[in-house]
């Protein structure tokens, strides 16, 4: 008889795990508290405009290929990928921007034109980054984080000094241009920590950027979610929407015995949570929780975000599909996220206009705009603050790109700390999970298997391997393999 597994949540890691577990012959049910699937990667449609509510960057295409290949499929069986050209654009001041080409040779030329001799240093840096990528993404990140010995290989031992240096030091060894430094330090922001707190080994993110390029699934990132749901359904996974898990039930021997869902008890013998780890533990009696409130409070979390989804009644100029605005003090903004949590004085921000390359995103002649300001998790969140910062960044956007856009806003929707808590039960309203610092890597992250409750597992951005969409796909695989290994 097939054994039942219930998965809480339907984000990337939960969907990934559901596919692997169904393939192994388990009877899998996914319980989603919201009315649509996808977790943070849901979709928002209004007046002919389409927005991804969450993740908007498609990096590490090989990880997606590897996921679908495990089921005899390809990404192209479910969605169409376009390589973006340019990959993205970075603004450093008024009418001062650099476009990151999809072609590595062009990137070398751009570096050399900005700083003589920098192309040679970039090549050396990317050689190291590629080697680290092959070690990390093709091997280490697929480890379950049970033992420190998982990190010990001949290749990692040879690079041990990189774990005790940091990205900021490595980037600045040979590159002096402030513009180029900002470009090279940008990719590790996806890992949720400051470059000065991110081990130098993580320079593999620069290879993911320059070496593998930036892609876009036609129709948006939600196409990936729909592809995974289609795959899961074909494997026999059941989905239940508006299914709010209120408690995880256990027997006297501390085995999972059931779930309280919308006030009703359902029997199950194994639970895998793709929901927020901290929130999941609050669904247990206090003596069955592995980590105290003090533990969580001491951890370094990735930022929260203030997001705006904006419909414009005209096409936007002087920007790209992905555009970063690094014209203000990065160190001050980082300090106001990690060290002295407060609303940023003069924030960096990110803008995304999918309709520049994908005509499914907006009606003809109009533009779908997505704006993001990284924030400290847990800070005050009011409508007044949201409105203030909307005008702050649109004023800057107009000045830097030399155009008027405010008058062209048809509608806007915001999403911030309160919404991350309400919609995703996110700890302190964080957006990306727990940061990948040296002391929050691999076996030092919250465990994928509960040490106090039998047959309770976790997957997602607070456990291994960490924040981001590709790591979420991998996390689902790791959790499913551990469940199988433990002979459930």
Segments (PLM) and residue ranges:
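A glycine-rich dinucleotide-binding beta-alpha-beta segment and adjacent secondary-structure elements
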Residues: 177-191, 348-350, 403-465
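FAD-dependent oxidoreductase catalytic-site/capping-region signature
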Residues: 348-435
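Rossmann-like flavin
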Residues: 93-199
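Helical element adjacent to the flavin cofactor pocket in flavoenzyme catalytic cores
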Residues: 204-256
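A conserved FAD-binding loop/helix module that cradles the flavin
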Residues: 55, 461-483
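N-terminal glycine-rich phosphate/pyrophosphate-binding loop and immediately adjacent elements
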Residues: 2-131
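Short beta-strand to alpha-helix junction loop
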Residues: 158-167, 210-230, 382-389
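Mid-domain catalytic core of redox enzymes
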Residues: 246-363
